[in-house]
Structures are given as C-alpha cells and as structure tokens.
C-alpha cells in the first residue's frame, strides 16, 4: 500500500467520522435552541406561596411554589392546577398570568424546569419531560391535595410537555404509556404543533434534525378521555394559531377550542380580557369534574 493510498484512506475515515459526529450532535444543538432559561427574579415570591424543592426521577433538584386556595383548606379546593410554563424565563415571570386561580377556590402548583430559575441542571427534551412527570407525581402525593382532582395547564412549550407526560407517542417505535391517574382536565394555551414544524418555520428543512416523539401532534389523541381545552390568540407572533386548529382536529372528544380575536402569545389569562377567558377555563374545569 502506497503512502498516497494510506493518506486517502485516513482522509476518508476522518470525513466519515465528522459526518457521524454531526449526525449525532446536530439534533441536540437544534433542540437546545428552543430553551431560553434564566434565573432573573421577575417579582417577589407570592406571600401565600410555599417554596418547594422536589426531586426529578433522575435526581435533579427542582424548585416550585404551592399556592393554596384562598378559601378554606387546600384538600377541599375545587381542583389543583399544575402550571407548566414555556421555553423562556421562569415561574416568577409567569406568575401574573395565573395569580388569579387561588381566588377561584383552586390550588396552584408552579415549578421551574431544570436549568430555569432556582432549579438545577441543564434543559433537554427528556429532562423537561422528566420534570413535568415529577411535578405531577409530587402534587399527586401531597397530603393536602385531593389526588383525584388534578388539572394540567400547559402554556406554549409547556403544552407539549403536558401531552407527552400523560399520553403516549402515536407512531413511535417504543410507545410511552403514562400515568393519567387523577388528571381530570388539560388546558393548552398557545401550544405549537411539533418541534419540527417550529424549526422549519425558522430555518426551512431544519425540522428533520429534531425528535418529534415529545411533540403535541404525536400525543394529543392519546390523552383521551381526559377533556382538553385549547386556547390560542389569532395574532400570536410566536406560534401560529393554525397550530392549535390542527391540534384540535387531532384531539379526541371531549374537547373544546377558543380562538381569541387579535390575541397574542399566552395572553388569554392576562388582564387584557378581564375575566372572559378565565371564566371559560373555570367553567371547563367544573364541567370536566362533574363528568364522573
């Protein structure tokens, strides 16, 4: 074998190595572009909040708040809402959007994913799913919570995590079956269809790099018979409202959709609309709870 031939072989192997590394790393780099965590404090901790540290299934320590109903004992509340936020900020930034819930005789549990706020770790698809499942399990086992009256509220990216946590991936080689015990209703606010669809909107063709097993479109049908409420503003500048229209078509009954004229991203429960969509959410929860 000549030296020139040897060099060609080494060069070919090196190129092959680079290709393999890129195939392995590019999807991880692409998905990490979805997460914008920070530990900035956007406002004071609610006076009535119990600061919680709980542990994800892989041992990561996570931070949360439990805010009890403003009316009587927590175990007698209408329901306990588990809030699952989006891909940026932390729960202190999202608190103003859900601060009204305890005044509706509802307990509220908020938490930060790994890498967000005071939670340890680094964000990843698998990690955020673990965190969401662990938050549900934590609330389910609190002594002062009725474990049969749980409601999941997922906003933006949080909707994908909610659906992946309590559903299974349709069409995936290894289906994930999840524990739906006590989950009586799911609310999705400004949720995107899939990771790949959002990536393709930003960079055409880049969606092929992403793992869609945890995407809303793969999981929404399998959460049935849990009732699903879908909300989305028609002027959302982050996630196209048509994503929610497609998710509604994929969802099974019972389901309900509310499209907010000129509504922006996750502002259904802001003060912009007074109590209009807040009342709609509470009515949906009450109807779901009375179903069985």
Swiss-Prot record:
What keywords were assigned to this record?
Membrane, Transmembrane, Transmembrane helix
Spans traversing the lipid bilayer: 13-35
Q: Which GO terms describe its cellular component?
A: membrane
Q: Does the keyword Phosphoprotein apply?
A: no
| Record-linked InterPro entries | AB_hydrolase_fold (IPR029058), Hydrolase_4 (IPR022742)
Q: Where in the cell is it found?
A: Membrane
Task: Work out whether the entry's keyword set contains Transmembrane.
Answer: yes
Question: Could you tell me the membrane topology recorded for this protein?
Answer: Single-pass membrane protein
Pfam families named among the record's database cross-references: Hydrolase_4
Q: Which Gene3D superfamilies match?
A: alpha/beta hydrolase
SUPFAM superfamilies on file: alpha/beta-Hydrolases
Say which family it is in: Belongs to the serine esterase family.
Instruction: Tell me what this protein is called.
Output: Uncharacterized protein YfhR
Organism for this UniProt entry: Salmonella typhimurium (strain LT2 / SGSC1412 / ATCC 700720)
Q: Which gene encodes it?
A: yfhR
